[in-house]
């Protein structure tokens, strides 16, 4: 259970702010920044007068929010929550985020602090344990909507994984929509492109983060549509989006490499291809995605020395077995239909009892 913490600002009608605003001698006066230069009389988040910002430079504020024994962050962790998702974490800044994260870990080792950070994530670690992956969301949506080619996507992704580190990537949340964005069914109107985006959400290094209704293809544009109530009328056994989401969840649960595996890019001209792997070759997963409008046949080099020649690869997303896909001397020829992905795993224990993986794990 991860709670949403808004520690940068509060509502104008909050008793603490009302006291500070009304009484210059209030004990809460220095919890905010007042002055005639601000519309509404106090510094407010993005100049929204109803959202006065907290003065985090005041140690008393930080003591109340996260440093003190009875602070908001620490008391809720003691009560059993597992972590915090920090609203507008980029506004809190590196220094105070790191202070908050240290306080959380001191109170509850292993607790998670996830920052809503729209910036390039590299330097925000270890100020937070993880980020909401704005950059990866934009990359995925641009790819499946035909606004970015696979080579550019692969280059940017590889740089981000290398610079941020795989552990930080694995902890971070991969989301495709939330309460601040139009919903996926609206931003990606093509159904096959939408399904492809979801495959990437569940196979790229990170933790998939689902927004209620997304599993049902619930539509929604700008505010207030993006925050509309749940569409319970869409829940049915016939909902293809729900069935697809359940399939992706089960696939990720059953294949360890998709949860904790390392990442290795696979070079391609027209496809997006990458490998997720652990210390066990049997857990290796290859992902080959085609965001284009036409089927693509290409030969890829899979630079994994543990994968044996002539290994058959099983497509984890296939409804019915198709033509066998085999790895020959590290080369893999694939045909990927338009706006589709293959998620392949090596068959290391084929029927018949013999395996050339007997001394390779």
Model-flagged regions — what are they?
Residues 2-3, 84-85, 112-115, 173-175, ...:
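Structural recognition of the beta-strand scaffold that forms the well-ordered cores
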Residues 4, 76, 86, 113, ...:
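Conserved, mostly hydrophobic/aromatic
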Residues 1-79, 100, 104-107, 123:
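Substrate-binding/active-site clefts of carbohydrate-active enzymes
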Residues 182-188:
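Short, solvent-exposed helix-loop connector elements
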Residues 80-82, 175, 335:
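Short loop/turn motifs at secondary-structure junctions
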Residues 78-81, 129, 206-207:
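A structural motif
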Residues 17-21, 71, 82-168, 172, ...:
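Active-site-proximal helices and loops of the catalytic beta/alpha 8
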Residues 194, 205, 210, 216-361:
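Carbohydrate-interacting/catalytic domains
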């Amino acid at each position: 259970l991860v709670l949403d913490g808004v520690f940068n600002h509060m509502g104008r009608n909050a008793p603490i702010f009302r006291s500070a605003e009304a009484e210059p001698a209030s004990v809460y006066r220095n919890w905010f920044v007042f002055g005639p230069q601000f519309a509404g009389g106090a510094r407010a988040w993005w100049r929204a007068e109803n959202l006065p910002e907290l003065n985090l430079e005041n140690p008393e504020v930080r003591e109340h929010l996260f440093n003190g024994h009875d602070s908001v962050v620490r008391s809720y962790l003691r009560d059993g929550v597992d972590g915090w998702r920090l609203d507008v974490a980029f506004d809190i800044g590196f220094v105070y985020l790191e202070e908050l994260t240290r306080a959380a870990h001191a109170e509850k080792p292993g607790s998670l602090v996830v920052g809503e950070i729209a910036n390039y994530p590299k330097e925000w670690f270890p100020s937070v344990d993880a980020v909401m992956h704005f950059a990866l969301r934009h990359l995925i949506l641009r790819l499946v909507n035909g606004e970015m080619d696979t080579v550019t996507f692969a280059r940017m992704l590889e740089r981000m994984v290398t610079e941020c580190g795989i552990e930080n990537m694995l902890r971070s949340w991969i989301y495709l929509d939330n309460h601040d964005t139009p919903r996926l069914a609206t931003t990606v109107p093509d159904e096959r492109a939408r399904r492809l985006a979801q495959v990437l959400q569940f196979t790229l290094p990170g933790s998939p983060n689902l927004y209620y209704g997304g599993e049902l293809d619930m539509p929604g544009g700008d505010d207030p549509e993006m925050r509309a109530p749940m569409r319970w009328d869409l829940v049915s056994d016939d909902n293809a989006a729900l069935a697809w989401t359940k399939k992706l969840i089960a696939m990720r649960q059953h294949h360890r490499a998709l949860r904790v595996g390392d990442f290795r890019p696979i070079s391609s001209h027209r496809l997006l291809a990458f490998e997720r792997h652990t210390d066990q070759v049997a857990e290796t997963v290859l992902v080959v995605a085609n965001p284009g409008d036409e089927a693509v046949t290409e030969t890829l080099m899979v630079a994994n020395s543990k994968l044996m020649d002539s290994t058959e690869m099983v497509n984890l997303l296939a409804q019915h077995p198709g033509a066998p896909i085999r790895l020959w001397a590290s080369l893999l020829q694939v045909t990927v239909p338009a706006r589709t992905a293959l998620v392949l795993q090596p068959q290391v224990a084929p029927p018949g009892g013999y395996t050339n993986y007997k001394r390779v794990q």
